[in-house]
């Protein structure tokens, strides 16, 4: 390694200009790291918190250290929490046996991209499954709804589009309608619009933005029609409601919706209502909520805590081999819908693993150009 830091700009530009196959390679590599975590939770050590100035009761600055130790990848993520400037930090990757530093990254882009990739692992598995076609895409249209307009929201939409572009969906898909729901600030769509040209004439992309006002807003219809829903808003009150998914007008045929929620990360936060979570407790077929970590989601996710979700109601992404335990049937009141619900709170394992994968992909990309 040279004496440089891999910047957020470098990471962003690499993934904005990579192929769909590179996205899939990164996703599968991240899935493997979560398998290692599920097999041995001890590779993720306890977080360490330290206030910068413990003599000052008014000081809001604290440091968070998140070490990862395994034979496959080792390193540490360090964040500084300043309530006035949000989180800033770094990710250091080392060789597990020698301790040699092999990569030092600014943390913002890696964090956002690894979260979006983790969100889409289950989606990729379901889209690419040839035995059980869950997605019907009525009238040749895939409806994707995203709550939020920030960095996380952008990467969720971008990666989902790249997966669809990879060809795993089939030739029947003609249109991807993306509906972005926001509170105050709209998303800049320049980068997403540039993807339209990559689809060619076979698939079109339509981009819409709606402000979240109330349940009767125009965006509510977008939610009810959705094949894919991403929740990327840190919010105390729910934005997604079970009754939106039970809307019998949403589909005349059986419909499947993949939902991933990543915005809430504290017990007081809620992205969806209690009624939706409770469906997984009452399901006779024992469908589970897909999570990155049982332990951490049950400590940090307000939605799961309020519904008293038990560990057996959850399945870790690292345990995901078949799809049957992640599909919940909502067929009631005339609604023909199944859903998969994924909840991500984030693990340092994901940061260190993706940082290491980035180094490998960048080296391979450089060699291919020579």
UniProtKB/Swiss-Prot annotation:
Keywords: Acetylation
GO-annotated cellular components: cytoplasm
Modified residues (N-acetylmethionine): 1
Gene3D superfamilies (alphabetical): NAD(P)-binding Rossmann-like Domain, ornithine cyclodeaminase, domain 1
Family: Belongs to the ornithine cyclodeaminase/mu-crystallin family.
Extra information: Present with 172 molecules/cell in log phase SD medium.
Protein name: Uncharacterized protein YGL159W
């Amino acid at each position: 390694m040279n004496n440089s830091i891999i910047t957020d700009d470098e990471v962003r530009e690499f993934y904005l200009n990579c192929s769909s196959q590179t996205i899939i390679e990164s996703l599968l590599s991240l899935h493997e790291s979560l398998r290692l975590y599920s097999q041995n939770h001890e590779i993720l050590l306890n977080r360490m918190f330290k206030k910068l100035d413990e003599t000052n009761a008014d000081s809001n600055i604290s440091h968070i250290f998140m070490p990862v130790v395994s034979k496959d990848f080792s390193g540490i993520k360090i964040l500084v929490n300043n309530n006035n400037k949000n989180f800033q930090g770094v990710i250091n990757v080392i060789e597990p046996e020698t301790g040699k530093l092999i990569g030092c990254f600014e943390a913002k882009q890696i964090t956002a991209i690894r979260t979006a990739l983790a969100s889409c692992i289950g989606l990729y598995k379901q889209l690419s499954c040839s035995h059980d076609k869950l997605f019907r895409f009525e009238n040749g249209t895939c409806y994707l709804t995203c709550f939020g307009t920030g960095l996380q929201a952008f990467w969720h939409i971008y990666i989902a589009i790249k997966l669809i572009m990879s060809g795993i969906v089939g030739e029947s898909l003609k249109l991807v309608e993306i509906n972005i729901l926001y509170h105050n600030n709209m998303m800049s769509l320049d980068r997403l619009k540039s993807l339209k040209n990559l689809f060619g004439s076979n698939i079109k992309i339509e981009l819409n933005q709606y402000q979240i006002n109330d349940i009767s807003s125009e965006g509510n219809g977008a939610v009810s029609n959705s094949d894919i829903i991403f929740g990327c808003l840190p919010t105390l009150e729910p934005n997604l409601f079970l009754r939106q998914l039970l809307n019998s007008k949403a589909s005349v045929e059986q419909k499947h919706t993949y939902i991933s929620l990543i915005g809430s990360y504290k017990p007081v936060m809620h992205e969806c209502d209690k009624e939706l979570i409770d469906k997984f407790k009452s399901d006779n077929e024992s469908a589970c909520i897909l999570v990155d970590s049982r332990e951490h989601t049950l400590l940090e996710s307000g939605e799961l805590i309020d519904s008293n979700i038990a560990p057996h109601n959850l399945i870790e992404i690292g345990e995901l081999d078949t799809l049957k335990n992640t599909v919940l049937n909502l067929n009631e009141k005339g609604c023909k819908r199944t859903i998969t619900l994924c909840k991500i709170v984030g693990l340092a394992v994901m940061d260190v693993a993706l940082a290491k994968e980035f180094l490998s992909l960048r080296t391979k990309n450089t060699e291919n150009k020579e």
